[in-house]
Amino acid sequence: MEFFISMSETIKYNDDDHKTLFLKTLNEQRLEGEFCDIAIVVEDVKFRAHRCVLAACSTYFKKLFKKLEVDSSSVIEIDFLRSDIFEEVLNYMYTAKISVKKEDVNLMMSSGQILGIRFLDKLCSQKRDVSSPDENNGQSKSKYCLKINRPIGDAADTQDDDVEEIGDQDDSPSDDTVEGTPPSQEDGKSPTTTLRVQEAILKELGSEEVRKVNCYGQEVESMETPESKDLGSQTPQALTFNDGMSEVKDEQTPGWTTAASDMKFEYLLYGHHREQIACQACGKTFSDEGRLRKHEKLHTADRPFVCEMCTKGFTTQAHLKEHLKIHTGYKPYSCEVCGKSFIRAPDLKKHERVHSNERPFACHMCDKAFKHKSHLKDHERRHRGEKPFVCGSCTKAFAKASDLKRHENNMHSERKQVTPSAIQSETEQLQAAAMAAEAEQQLETIACS
């Protein structure tokens, strides 16, 4: 039998592998730093990404980019997530898979709620990969690790035998909830403490109700107080939406009322005016005591994450991962101007500012702009009259750490202070000693004759 197809007919083809290949290619580009147009800094760890991917996966980033109109050279710093949590969130955006420790499930859900990522916000009702010891030939996975896969396309309709539900659809705990002693808390990152901080933020933002969550023995009670209701109808001072945000107001994060959602975004976008706490060692300021304690580990010997190749210690596992790249010796990112090579693309980007006049960090109090964020922070301290770096010998204060170090070397070090008068005095002493030696030699010559 012959088939005749008219030229006017339309034939449709579906590429079932396209979606998977598309994500795989995007993730490879991110890992290599190719075409990345945004850098997100979390706990001093820089993550390169594609702005369109962040905006597509997160309503928070979508609103953020529309609000700020950031360009390709922008660096955004967020301070309401842990770096290891954000790393997993970023991996999920590019792979549709996420691995999360059981003690961090609630924290991951809270992060998903704030970032506006529905899948992470509903982790307890998602499907997870569960492998029993028998299925793995006696080798089970980590006791406190779950690998959660998000179905792609038609794969959502199929279920493998090793996939089971986590919790019920109404977010209430299921009968087969994992029981047992909670995992030990490491590195001071207590899940309870972290959730308490998150609850305080939600209260302050005026959320009328926070869903009751119970995953793996951790519970966050619903919270409804008169104070929070009052806050829900108020807008924080100087933190208001402009007319340009009206078209995106309807894209609320699940679980937030309209007023609370607006306040939440403004809070996360601009921060909250709190009293700053300064580090006694270096003067760096923080908005809460928890972040200060974490920073103070940099000045102590508490560095539990040790490199096996050089025994150098680090305070977080993310910092250790960054350090391990040094030992590979592979530096794929080279400067086109001077040929200097770098391990990471962000380091090359930072170096390239030396050859250009790019100054992305602008002062909001004057017209000056700087190539590095640290220089901007030093400059802003001068505007505010802050001098957090205090000399331990004479209590003289300075705005920059380098000024304090220079002062200590010049005034309080064991070396003699070098001044023009000191140089002249030392020269005169040398000349006098030379003349005395010459006179003594002449006397010895006369005596011998």
Curated annotation (Swiss-Prot):
PROSITE patterns registered for this protein in UniProt: BTB, ZINC_FINGER_C2H2_1, ZINC_FINGER_C2H2_2
SMART domains according to UniProt: BTB (SM00225), ZnF_C2H2 (SM00355)
Keyword presence, Isomerase: no
Covalent cross-link Glycyl lysine isopeptide (Lys-Gly) (interchain with G-Cter in SUMO2), where: K46, K203, K249
Chief localisation class: nucleus
Keywords assigned by UniProt, alphabetized: Activator, DNA-binding, Isopeptide bond, Metal-binding, Nucleus, Repeat, Repressor, Transcription, Transcription regulation, Ubl conjugation, Zinc, Zinc-finger
Region (Disordered): 153-194
Motif residue range(s): Nuclear localization signal: 50-66
MF term (GO), any: transcription cis-regulatory region binding
Cell compartments where the protein resides: Nucleus
Cellular component terms (Gene Ontology): aggresome; cytosol; nucleolus; nucleoplasm; nucleus
Subunit structure: Interacts with ZBTB21.
Entry similarity comment: Belongs to the krueppel C2H2-type zinc-finger protein family.
Comment, domains: The BTB/POZ domain seems to direct the protein to discrete regions in the nucleus.
Function: Transcriptional activator of the dopamine transporter (DAT), binding it's promoter at the consensus sequence 5'-CCTGCACAGTTCACGGA-3'. Binds to 5'-d(GCC)(n)-3' trinucleotide repeats in promoter regions and acts as a repressor of the FMR1 gene. Transcriptional repressor of MYC and thymidine kinase promoters.
Protein name as it appears in the record: Zinc finger and BTB domain-containing protein 14
Species in which this protein is naturally found: Homo sapiens
Gene: ZBTB14
